[in-house]
Regions:
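Hydrophobic beta-strand anchors of alpha/beta hydrolase catalytic cores
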Residues: 27-28, 55, 101
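Thiol/disulfide oxidoreductase modules built on the thioredoxin-like
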Residues: 73-77, 84-130
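A generic structural signal for alpha->beta connector loops
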Residues: 5, 24, 52, 78-79
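Nucleotide phosphate-binding site architecture
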Residues: 9, 36, 46, 110
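Non-globular targeting/processing and membrane-anchoring segments
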Residues: 1, 133-137
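Structural microenvironment flanking redox-active thiols in thiol-disulfide oxidoreductases
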Residues: 39-75, 85-92
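Short active-site neighborhood of thiol/selenol oxidoreductases, capturing the structured segment around
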Residues: 16-39, 45
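N-terminal "domain-start" segment that seeds a small globular fold
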Residues: 1-19
Length: 137
């Protein structure tokens, strides 16, 4: 499916964002400061980001200041963070909780995983699809 249309704000600057601001190949990671499993997977996301994987954060049903403080404490692996304060975009994407991760290629979801992404999941779910689709992150 395609990324649903949305009009939300960027977490830090509070500038308006829409699906038109997202292009190319990247991950969308659904996370929240209140999510314990998000903290568990965070180190792996940092590793991916340092290796050049583009990651957009979708901050899910979270208080803006709590989310910013959380990223300051644990570091920010995201190229961009969408503040989905009421969960509307997540709902439109079929999200049932956090964390969830989507692989996006040119506006379309080509892989999706519910739960913690770690090295094993990265290889089994995402790398396989990346190789099969011949996309470059």
């Amino acid at each position: 499916f395609e990324i649903p249309s949305f009009d939300l704000t960027e977490l830090y600057k509070e500038t308006e964002l829409s699906n038109e601001d997202l292009s190319g190949n990247f991950l969308i990671n659904v996370w929240a400061s209140w999510c314990i499993t998000c903290r568990v997977e965070h180190g792996f996301l940092e590793k991916l980001s340092k290796n050049g994987v583009r990651i957009v954060g979708l901050n899910y049903k979270d208080d803006r200041s709590d989310a910013i403080d959380w990223l300051k404490k644990y570091r920010d692996p995201y190229e961009l963070v969408i503040h989905d304060f009421d969960g509307s975009l997540a709902l439109d994407m079929g999200v049932t909780g956090a964390p969830e991760t989507f692989l996006i290629s040119n506006g379309k979801v080509i892989a999706h995983y519910r739960g913690e992404v770690n090295q094993m999941i990265w290889e089994d779910v995402f790398i396989r699809v990346i190789k099969d689709s011949e996309i470059i992150l």
